[in-house]
Amino acid sequence: MAEIRNYTMNFGPQHPAAHGVLRLVMELDGEVIRRADPHIGLLHRATEKLAENKTYVQSVPYMDRLDYVSMMVNEHAYVMAIEKLLQIEVPIRAQYIRVMFDEITRILNHLLWLGAHALDVGAMTVFLYAFREREDLMDCYEAVSGARLHAAYYRPGGVYRDLPDNMPQYQPSAIHDEKATRARNENRQGSLLDFIEDFTRRFPGYIDDYEALLTDNRIWKQRLVDIGVVSPDRAKALGFTGPMLRGSGVEWDLRKKQPYEVYDQVDFDIPVGANGDCYDRYLVRIEEMRQSNHIIKQCVEWLRKNPGPVITDNHKVAPPSRLAMKQNMEEMIHHFKLFTEGMHVPRGEAYAAVEHPKGEFGIYIVSDGANKPYRLKIRAPGFAHLAALDEMTKGHMIADLVAIIGTQDIVFGEIDR
């Protein structure tokens, strides 16, 4: 008699729905998944080890490259941990700028997640719409830091520089003539705050467009409802955070429960799911984009009325201005020491966590009093989510695996570190 056995199949690391370099070794009974074993490490770059050989400020750009879709939020956790060790106050204007860019980054992340998730499931249009909006937010990154992706904008003690008074302008090219260029530059005539305010006015309408395409779409609901269900207790036991935890009905958000920066001074709600399935996690992230938009509006309003310093005046931590450095010998020494040797952080240890678009992103630093960390540990939210993939997919069809990976919002930069 013929023996009936499950067969083993590789999913990824080249599969377009694998979100980077995910490799799954799956045990299948026909089309039903019996086991899904994630193999990680293909994007390991030894970030934690590299940070031990760099000064504290030199490691800021490494943070951008962890979750390379949520750049500034990674930096935020890192500089907050350093500030805890240094026990320095961050100027209130810098705190508002950080919160504003954290929420811009959250929208950037969720737009990419939405576009990629819909594309994996088979809806192409949303992907194109999402990238149209991402372009405007990338321009905000570029205006403050000069880079569209790896900004390296946050610094221990504040941010690199204040918000610019004018936006970069498009130039005529072979593709766009003078008239088309004028139309493209229409909302770029004012400052960065004007540009962001214009975006916040338009964005709720765009979210309505995404929802019109997906939320009540029969095929979308058939692919997501009752797929990858996780109960509230199980979500907590598995170490879920962020939208994955809130999608299961647990109202936990670090911005509300353990407020940092000025999150206790802005108004927003925590969206929570009811059933803990892929569809609930989709709805939670959609509503998070609306809440982020609301927070950005409040930050823009406050920043308009309150000019001020954007980085600490402690020159043992932050460099003096270029003008002061060229006029004063003491400032020049500070500048030279900071950029050659770096700052010496007091002996001790600190953990700082932020509400990252994917969950709780934490940085744990151990300092031995030198100008480099003795040890840096990164707590990546996606790591716990990926570890639960086997449990979430068991008993589902192979087509549902793609929907579950999409709903986890996995980026391998932070998982492999």
UniProtKB/Swiss-Prot annotation:
* Signal as UniProt keyword: no
Q: What's its EC? A: 7.1.1.-
Q: What's a single GO MF annotation on this record?
A: NADH:ubiquinone reductase (non-electrogenic) activity
Annotated InterPro entries = NADH_Q_OxRdtase_suD, NADH_UbQ_OxRdtase_49kDa_CS, NDH1_su_D/H, NiFe-Hase_large
Just give the chief location class.
membrane
Membrane-topology descriptor: Peripheral membrane protein
Note the PROSITE patterns from the entry.
COMPLEX1_49K
One Pfam family it belongs to: Complex1_49kDa
- The kind of enzyme this is, by top-level EC class, is translocase
> A cellular component term (GO) from this record?
plasma membrane
Q: Does the entry feature the keyword Membrane, yes or no? A: yes
Q: Catalyzes what?
A: a quinone + NADH + 5 H(+)(in) = a quinol + NAD(+) + 4 H(+)(out)
What the entry lists under Gene3D superfamilies is as follows:
Cytochrome-c3 Hydrogenase, chain B (1.10.645.10)
Q: Which compartments does it reside in? A: Cell inner membrane
Keywords assigned: Cell inner membrane, Cell membrane, Membrane, NAD, Quinone, Translocase, Transport, Ubiquinone
Q: Which family does it belong to?
A: Belongs to the complex I 49 kDa subunit family.
Protein's job: NDH-1 shuttles electrons from NADH, via FMN and iron-sulfur (Fe-S) centers, to quinones in the respiratory chain. The immediate electron acceptor for the enzyme in this species is believed to be ubiquinone. Couples the redox reaction to proton translocation (for every two electrons transferred, four hydrogen ions are translocated across the cytoplasmic membrane), and thus conserves the redox energy in a proton gradient.
The protein's matches in PANTHER family, at most eight in alphabetical order, are given as: NADH DEHYDROGENASE [UBIQUINONE] IRON-SULFUR PROTEIN 2, MITOCHONDRIAL, NADH-UBIQUINONE OXIDOREDUCTASE 49 KDA SUBUNIT
- Self-association state and partner proteins as the record states: NDH-1 is composed of 14 different subunits. Subunits NuoB, C, D, E, F, and G constitute the peripheral sector of the complex.
Read off the NCBIfam families from this record: NuoD, PRK06075.1
Q: Under which name does UniProt file this protein?
A: NADH-quinone oxidoreductase subunit D
Organism, scientific name: Nitrosomonas europaea (strain ATCC 19718 / CIP 103999 / KCTC 2705 / NBRC 14298)
Q: Encoded by which gene?
A: nuoD
